[in-house]
């Protein structure tokens, strides 16, 4: 995880991309996650792996319209798979767009295409957030590399693995 970037920008800056590429080029990481900008930023496919530059504000109060990206969030589901040679790879990366409710309270609300809880603000508002998120996430080629929207009512939940009993 790196804490870098220009606040409220939907485009990663030189510090973010330089640091993320250096981390990936080290060979020590299979996924790099960035936060700090309080805005959704692209997911970049990089040498067969992925960099998530910004997931917005998962915990937020409403921002004024000029900083509306501060009211938008991105939930990521990253599924890793162990390969036969013992290395790990990202075998599925999905995103779900979300916003807070601005009409009197702050509440996480998915604006995913399948609208699992119904309309957050209005059909037009929700669609605007969703499409702005889609365009931003895919701005560096994520969709072409298999990254997709997480449809909360259609994608099966990942299995829950119970912790092993401690011997003692």
Predicted regions and their residues:
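A short C-terminal boundary segment appended to hydrolase-like catalytic domains
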Residues: 67-168
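Alpha-helix initiation/capping motif
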Residues: 12-13, 110
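Conserved beta-sheet core of the metallophosphoesterase superfamily
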Residues: 14-74
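Short, acidic Gly/Pro/Ser/Thr-rich loop/turn segments
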Residues: 7-8, 60, 100-102
